[in-house]
Amino acid sequence: NKASVVANQLIPINTALTLIMMKAEVVTPMGIPAEDIPRIIGMQVNRAVPLGTTLMPDMVKNYE
């Protein structure tokens, strides 16, 4: 089971992601893989992401 990126806090809309906002957790359904954390630092979320929410590819601007 691979870990996904999960919000460690409420991330407001248009906020650039930092390491402290995220944690790796095994969740279902899977979201952005935890190994992509270095790649998504500095990318903005396109919606508010509540604490404990799995980050999905469509929540992060320019995540392919």
From Swiss-Prot:
The keyword Oxidoreductase does not apply. InterPro entries: AFP_Neu5c_C, AFP_Neu5c_C_sf, Antifreeze_III, SAF. It comes from Lycodichthys dearborni. It is found in: Secreted. Contributes to protect fish blood from freezing at subzero sea water temperatures. Lowers the blood freezing point. Binds to nascent ice crystals and prevents further growth. Transmembrane segments: none annotated. Belongs to the type-III AFP family. Residues 4-63 form the AFP-like domain. GO terms for cellular component: extracellular region. Detected in blood serum (at protein level). Pfam families: SAF. Keywords: Antifreeze protein, Secreted. This is Ice-structuring protein RD2. The record marks 9, 14, 18, 44 as: Important for ice-binding.
